[in-house]
């Protein structure tokens, strides 16, 4: 039984993965680089410091990485108002707080986006802290975000909740299990194959099944 939970933001609590994919697609196109959008979607969950090389190569990262990240941020800013909380997101966070769990958002978003999404969710008072890109040197699948979130939670043990391969891999490198949801566009089988401890078809299903996870009350 864990006393802390780390929550991914994009694709897990906020329906934003496809907006991020479109933003990156457009950013690449403005630099004359065509990357199929389905391939970009598979990389969402990585931060921009990892995504450029993964989508293209080290030469493009070296020559254009910073300008591509800047362009992607501008494109996403234009799409951000189209993002919305995923069904059951606020209720899940509220339930985690009700269980007296330490709740930390494990994100490498910039501070502005994170504050915007916290306001959308309406759960700022229900979380104990969060990470942003300023807290990490390398984004997922490196464990920096997870380790920074653990530090804010004041523990070395927690459960990760996420939607992607990159969440699972980052958590595993910090020896944490992941409860995964398919809300980010990865299939149940894929998430299981990458090592998720359990997979849920919605945040509501996850909330209703919490007593079957390490987040159950200690009395159970």
What function would you assign to each model-found segment?
Residues 23, 51, 113-116, 170, ...:
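Phosphate- and divalent-cation-binding pockets in alpha/beta enzyme and binding domains
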Residues 159-200:
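Acidic, Mg2+-coordinating phosphoryl-transfer loop and its flanking beta/alpha structural elements
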Residues 34, 61, 124-128, 197-200:
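Conserved H-loop
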């Amino acid at each position: 039984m864990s006393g802390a939970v780390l929550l991914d933001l994009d694709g897990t609590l906020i329906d934003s993965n496809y907006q991020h994919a479109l933003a990156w697609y457009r950013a690449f196109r403005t630099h004359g680089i065509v990357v199929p959008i389905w391939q970009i979607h598979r990389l969402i969950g990585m931060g921009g410091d990892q995504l450029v090389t993964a989508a293209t190569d080290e030469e493009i990262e070296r020559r254009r990485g910073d300008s591509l990240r800047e362009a992607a941020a501008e494109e996403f800013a234009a799409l951000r108002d189209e993002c919305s909380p995923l069904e059951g997101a606020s209720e899940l966070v509220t339930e985690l707080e009700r269980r007296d769990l330490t709740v930390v958002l494990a994100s490498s978003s910039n501070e502005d986006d994170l504050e915007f999404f916290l306001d959308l969710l309406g759960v700022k008072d229900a979380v104990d802290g969060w990470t942003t890109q300023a807290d990490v040197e390398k984004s997922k699948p490196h464990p920096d975000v997870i380790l920074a979130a653990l530090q804010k939670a004041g523990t070395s043990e927690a459960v990760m909740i996420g939607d992607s391969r990159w969440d699972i891999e980052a958590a595993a490198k910090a020896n944490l299990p992941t409860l995964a949801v398919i809300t980010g566009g990865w299939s149940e089988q894929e998430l299981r194959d990458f090592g998720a401890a359990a997979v849920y078809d919605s945040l509501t299903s996850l909330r209703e099944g919490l007593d079957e996870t390490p987040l159950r009350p200690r009395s159970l």
